[in-house]
């Protein structure tokens, strides 16, 4: 989309760069902010990115990959990645004249921001943080995607817990079908 409403939607500094946000991504962010606004612009970026990834068929936003290799994770152009870096860096308070590069920090700033994202707090929040590592979240899900993943995991674990006996003549039957090799 070349033009987006200004309501909490981060805009690239360069007009030559356009974000890949869909109207649904933007509506998701507006919905979240209409129910509980956040003053942290990284929260807005995370909400947009989670929705964007869901639209691409991914169940979650992997915060480690976002930090270490955003181009691979998002499949964006170099210009879009640079705009994301610039937007993210300008979103965080800093004392120095030039904003820090969040992608070169020693601790994942995306995970730190997600940790206090208001839309991922509580049992019925619209987003879920998962897979804690060193006290920081590793993934951000839309709640429905997280619930679907949990349901699949439970079903697989139930199947794995089921024990059944293998008939004694199974090896014989397999040899008859496939030979000794």
Predicted regions and their residues:
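Helicase P-loop NTPase motor core of nucleic-acid translocases
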Residues: 1-181
